[in-house]
Design a protein with these regions (language model features):
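Short acidic/polar mixed-charge low-complexity motifs
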Residues: 119-121, 144
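Compact, glycine/acidic-enriched structural inserts
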Residues: 146-167
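A generic structural signal for short, non-catalytic loop/turn and secondary-structure boundary residues
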Residues: 106-107, 129-131
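Intrinsically disordered, low-complexity regulatory segments enriched in Ser/Thr/Pro
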Residues: 132-141
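Short, surface-exposed beta-strand/loop micro-motifs that present aromatic residues
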Residues: 121-128
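A surface-exposed partner-binding patch
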Residues: 1-119, 187-196
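Acidic, proline/glycine-rich low-complexity IDRs
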Residues: 165-196
């Protein structure tokens, strides 16, 4: 484990039990498949935390040989699912529109989805960043509300585990626990084998 990356995530998650951790080769292949460099905070997350449940709420996709948690697979699946749901919403009486915090709707056009919340929300990067990081955004379960989550993945989890959680997760939301519960490779393999 990289001392700097590990200590960063150990500060974010006071209770950290790592799951399956991808190697650098898997991270590089995922970046090549997606067509952009993976943010430094995300790479550190993958190498320190791996597959699991963050804050009791979010599953962050990581490069893995298991479709249910693989970054490239999930990025495409979530984008397709959100697109299909938005298309259904557009068939209603009023046209669908994203209500983006700050008013810059173009962040949705540059979205790469990389995480899902237990409440039906989705996390995505605005891949226009140039400093080695991408802003993290949250698409609420209503598939309309888009809130700024943080300037990096560690910033996002720091914000949602603090009183500022309601600014990201929505009015009335309580701070999430500073906990990461990893899922072991053996468990992921059994789950993959059990699927039809």
């Amino acid at each position: 484990m990289d001392g700097g990356a590990g200590s960063m995530w150990e500060q974010v998650f006071a209770d950290l039990a790592p799951g399956f951790v991808p190697d650098d080769g898997a991270l590089d292949r995922a970046a090549a498949d997606l067509g952009f460099p993976l943010p430094a905070s995300y790479r550190a997350f993958c190498r320190t935390c791996g597959v699991g449940l963050a804050g009791g709420q979010f599953r962050i996709a990581v490069p893995a040989p298991f479709e249910a948690c693989d970054l490239v697979t999930q990025a495409g699946l979530i984008a397709h699912s959100v697109g299909a749901a938005v298309a259904m919403l557009e068939e209603g009486a009023e046209p669908h529109r994203f209500d983006v915090e700050g008013g810059e709707a173009s962040v949705v056009e540059r979205a790469c989805f990389f995480g899902a919340g237990e409440d039906g929300s989705f996390l995505f990067w605005d891949v226009s960043g140039t400093d080695g990081e991408y802003d993290v955004w949250l698409l609420a379960p209503d598939l309309e509300t888009v809130r700024f989550g943080g300037e990096s993945l560690d910033d996002f989890f720091t914000r949602v585990a603090a009183p500022s959680a309601a600014l990201v997760l929505g009015p009335g939301a309580e701070p999430l626990p500073a906990r990461f519960e990893g899922i072991a490779e053996a468990t992921l393999a059994r789950t993959e084998q059990a699927q039809p």
